[in-house]
Amino acid sequence: MNVYAIFADHVREAVAALVAEGIIAKDLDLARVVVEPPRDASHGDLATNAAMVLAKDAGLKPRELAERIAGKLGTVAGVKKVDVAGPGFINIALDGTFWPVVLAAVLTQGLDFGRSALGAGEKVNVEYVSANPTGPMHVGHCRGAVFGDALARLMDFAGFAVTKEYYINDAGAQVDVLARSAFLRYREALGEAIGEIPEGLYPGDYLVPVGQKLAAAHGPALKEKSETDWLPLVRAEAIATMMVAIREDLAALGISFDVFFSERSLSTGAVDRVGAAIEALRASGEVYEGRLPPPKGAPIEDWEDREQTLFRSTDFGDDVDRPLKKSDGSYTYFAGDIAYHKDKVDRGFLKMIDVWGADHGGYVKRMQAAVKAVSGGRATLDVELIQLVRLFRAGEPVRMSKRSGSFVTLREVVDEVGRDAVRFMMLFRKNDAPLDFDLAKVIEQSRENPVFYVQYAHARAKSILRNAAEEFADLPQQAASFATAPLARLDDEGEITLLRRLASWPRLVEQAAGAREPHRISFFLHELASEFHGQWNRGKDLPHLRFIIENDRELTSARLALVHGVATVLASGLKVLGVTAVDEMK
């Protein structure tokens, strides 16, 4: 039950009635009409800009049109009054009959309250993490992993058919470096003193088990082979081992994928799909042989003064056409990405979301251009950039990990503070802003720790319900059973504030999904938790506001219905974020 969508329909009906009466012109564009909370809660429960955005085309002054619309809205059931403010803003106050309907919807729909049909089942591919399989996941990967997973959950809750995908970068030079690093550990496992790890190889201890496994399987035989012979075998073993570790790290964060896609699969096997994608674009005129002009200002990384295979990305808004082959004839990374995204289109994904590190920001335009080209303009690619995470402990920067050799691993962070703290705090700031993550602060049991504050609100609600079950043994235990309680008795200012917040959850879900901003969910939950804690604290000072009133069974049942509603929406939002809604704090 989306209150704002319901009243947006009422506004459209009011406008249609005015058209039918010949008061205003027909065929008005209602796309910019919104119904939202007023900036000042004292102005009412809802506000609309309808008159302000329609007045010119309607042929009336904004305030005159506002008064006409207000007159129609005033007859809607559940409306207490409608005011016109300033030049033509419309404020709507709801009466006491409306909020019980909203709360009853929360109680009967449970965790599905707020679930939206916004996506209408549209297929969307969300690709995230896609870390090189060259080492353990680190804290930088962690933020992108949590963001991507929460975004996928949010899109699913908003009605999209979501596929979660991981792109395994197993075809570049970095995996050959991985193989050479693993081979060094193989020699070490055979008893050879390898000394200090040479520059250019991966120094972490995480490849020691790979070397031991190779030694156990092959003995010294690999040492007798040339690099050309041993490298593919060692590379495959190292990648497989790293991907097992990556999957385990992601599982520790509560993250799983529907698809793991190998980059190497694009250029091996019976069909060279990278070459095929290039030739398809050549046939449509979007690939040509030519020379790039010398760079102006800042150097262009992949510029070479030679005849080369180029993609016409400037036709799609990019700054310069992009090379698809290197001077040695091998494909550029961009060419592989074109083929990969073409594969997504071929699988039926016309809506794609990629989650990348902020350092890839310069790559966005060319990739969006490529998606337009390979799909004939049918598909869209949205890219969400993830800023860096700075790790602290009690205000002091955290030093590198011994295991990885150069960074703090994701598993170390999860093991120290727990999955819930990591996930919630990674989502308590917009993804394009840097994040300071303090290992000590995220496990504090205080209101300054957002994850504790929100989880405690859910646990407090459950505690109230347990206490009520002892006081009133004959009251029902299931939330849905409270939908028939005398909910109209919820008329205290704090109770109405909570009801307004619950009513805004469906709208918030659609807004967050539309903007691809799961942090809005964590902000909403923190606000709901704050209002719930505030109402509980008011009851400490004013006994008549307590949730359990021993001598008033009806009022108690109404307030317990509200507690159930708060717990339900908190649990629903936490589920979208992939965070546990705990019943008791430990």
From Swiss-Prot:
Monomer. Keywords: Aminoacyl-tRNA synthetase, ATP-binding, Cytoplasm, Ligase, Nucleotide-binding, Protein biosynthesis. It is found in: Cytoplasm. It catalyses: tRNA(Arg) + L-arginine + ATP = L-arginyl-tRNA(Arg) + AMP + diphosphate. One of its GO terms (biological process) is arginyl-tRNA aminoacylation. This is Arginine--tRNA ligase. One of its GO terms (molecular function) is arginine-tRNA ligase activity. A motif ('HIGH' region) lies at residues 131-141. Its main location: cytoplasm. It comes from Xanthobacter autotrophicus (strain ATCC BAA-1158 / Py2). Its EC number is 6.1.1.19. Belongs to the class-I aminoacyl-tRNA synthetase family. PANTHER family: ARGININE--TRNA LIGASE, CYTOPLASMIC (PTHR11956:SF5), ARGINYL-TRNA SYNTHETASE (PTHR11956). One of its GO terms (cellular component) is cytoplasm. The keyword Aminoacyl-tRNA synthetase applies.
